[in-house]
Amino acid sequence: MDINPLLYLQAFNNDATTFNTQGHILEQQSDSPYFDTFANAMQAYLDTKQGGNDEEGTIILMDDEDFNDSESLEDFLQMLSEEELNDGFSSDDEPEEHVILTEDNQGEPSETPQATFDITEFIKIDDED
């Protein structure tokens, strides 16, 4: 069965609970390209969304080893926490330059600000060997 990741993006856009449910359904798929497709589509959505939302998005895919290794998980969460603290002290006076690569502007800074959701998702991947 083919899964259209854009449906999951739309579901998340409407309701975070639906996104979690869809993520659980996605988790049941044994073929890893489903995860890659979903992650790529979600990241593309986050990268291209225009609007008044200034927050950044993060997608985290973790396998069983990461989930079972409490030290690495704690380290990872600590790293995320430190990044949030560092972001809090950054200067808002200087606008960030974002680059959108198209045929018209190869590498020129975009004057349009990029906007993404604030997302941190942990998707557990079960190996059914």
UniProtKB/Swiss-Prot annotation:
Residues 86-96 have a biased composition (Acidic residues). Residues 103-116 have a biased composition (Polar residues). Residues 86-116 are annotated as: Disordered. Belongs to the asfivirus D129L family. This is Uncharacterized protein D129L. It comes from African swine fever virus (strain Badajoz 1971 Vero-adapted). The lineage of its organism: Viruses, Varidnaviria, Bamfordvirae, Nucleocytoviricota, Pokkesviricetes.
